[in-house]
């Protein structure tokens, strides 16, 4: 579906902008009728960059992705895989 692609691409773009190894950024998506689960995988060296101090970057990423999904009537969950 087009909306999920937009949300996935948004998360991928944001993550690649934050890390030192953008070639290692991967986003896997799983969807149901109302929810999209996005699993973000980055290089081990970059995990701290996408989580941030006290999880602030991760929280910001989740907020942006959720806002984008809600606009299209879906719920988005971002999981950072280590």
Predicted segments — roles?
Residues 1-49, 60-82:
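RNA-contacting regions in translation and RNA-metabolism proteins
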């Amino acid at each position: 579906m087009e909306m999920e692609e937009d949300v996935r691409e948004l998360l991928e773009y944001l993550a690649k902008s934050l890390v030192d190894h953008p070639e290692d950024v991967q986003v896997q998506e799983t969807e149901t009728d109302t929810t999209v689960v996005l699993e973000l995988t980055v290089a081990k060296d970059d995990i701290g960059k996408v989580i941030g101090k006290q999880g602030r970057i991760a929280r910001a990423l989740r907020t942006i992705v959720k806002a984008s999904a809600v606009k299209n009537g879906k719920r988005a969950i971002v999981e950072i895989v280590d």
